[in-house]
């Protein structure tokens, strides 16, 4: 008996007979007319006894004196032997007393059907029955490292602000933007970190900065700049470190983190860079907004000086209409003793007309200062250079110091930065600049100034590398760096518009680099 599990092929054939015949007649004709035809190895009776050939199935119908039907022969032989056996069936020309014809029309591969079922079932098992894949070695290491970092993460204050484990014990702390930044720094062993969670600085963090040496470490985008501005107003920081342009602290590797922290700058330079001005109090007298902890050292003993006038040397520059070059005067012309006490009142403004009437006032800038009765001394305000041939009247204001008196100071005149001429065609980018203001996003434009894609500024450099010739202009809410200029030049980009221009050494002649202020 043929085992269906071992069947490899099924021979499909059809029979036509001129007469009425039945199944036993057809089976007898198959065994009788093929006996001894193919030799002892392929004799159907022997093959059926050994299980190489299965049960022969016959399905016939008789109609109008003729018989038609199909014959199915299962085989576990190989392809060659099965083909020989199928061909031998077509040699049968008579069944009983009737003439007949057998024709093979298909050899079915049973294993192919099984393979299809196996594939379909395997797809179902793979998609629905595997809950999780086997992780790779790197994934296992990252998971263990991440769990250790999460265990080390602690919280500070009633607001449960995320921070590193050494924030309270360390003399110096690092302020970052979010929880992911703390986890990345913990990964490389930096544990004295605390986050602010955006531009809304928590009061606990502002109070903590008064007791520590603080370094603000922010992202290299406009959001990081806004956080620094907020910290300068509500907290007391000493240094500022920035991530590379377009990168976030949470994405930096160890080498980039160490390099950024080593390049930190004092907060005084940041105040000058961002142009943060001193605020005025309600009584219209200027007050000193902040004093750095590194410079605020209380003296041991300060003797009280009453009714005594001190002389202070102030630099004075002469203004000459003959030349426009900057030129320093001799030491005799740059020194003058000035002493005068000013009553505590609103700051005075000296108009240009009054300065024109007195030539001495147009040539010299005087700073008058009284001795404060407090240990904290007011810093001298150095006079700024005035270019020759460009005289201007200076505004005189009074700065209130803790001694109850006021000091008349002359603020340095603002530098006039020449703005490069902008072509009239560049004004067409103004709508894009206005739409992107404060969004930290970028627009990639084609030759018709149509928006191809709008992405985040942090992804701009990597995304521009994927474009080839269809990009002609880029407008973004960020700083134009040398790296962006080089990438834009390699992609034949003609216009690069940002918020401001960073340290750029060279710009291609066929590229126009503009800022939003120029438009």
Curated annotation (Swiss-Prot):
- Which family would the database say this protein is a member of? Belongs to the archaeal DnaG primase family.
Cofactor remark:
Binds two Mg(2+) per subunit.
* UniProt keyword list: DNA replication, DNA-directed RNA polymerase, Exosome, Magnesium, Metal-binding, Nucleotidyltransferase, Primosome, Transcription, Transferase
User: Residue ranges of region Disordered?
Assistant: 316-374
Q: Where is the composition biased (Basic and acidic residues)?
A: 338-356
- At the top level, the lineage of the source is Archaea
Name the UniProt record assigns to this protein: DNA primase DnaG
Q: Main role?
A: RNA polymerase that catalyzes the synthesis of short RNA molecules used as primers for DNA polymerase during DNA replication. Also part of the exosome, which is a complex involved in RNA degradation. Acts as a poly(A)-binding protein that enhances the interaction between heteromeric, adenine-rich transcripts and the exosome.
Q: Name one GO biological process term.
A: DNA replication, synthesis of primer
Q: What organism is this sequence from?
A: Methanosarcina acetivorans (strain ATCC 35395 / DSM 2834 / JCM 12185 / C2A)
Q: CDD domains attached here?
A: TOPRIM_primases (cd01029)
Q: What PROSITE patterns does the record point to?
A: TOPRIM (PS50880)
Start and end of every Toprim domain? Answer: 171-257
Positions bound to Mg(2+) 2? 219, 221
> What cofactor does this chain's UniProt record say it requires?
Mg(2+)
Encoded by which gene? Answer: dnaG
The GO terms this record gives for MF are: DNA-directed RNA polymerase activity; metal ion binding; poly(A) binding
Q: What class of enzyme is it?
A: transferase
EC number per UniProt: 2.7.7.101
Subunit and partners? Forms a ternary complex with MCM helicase and DNA. Component of the archaeal exosome complex.
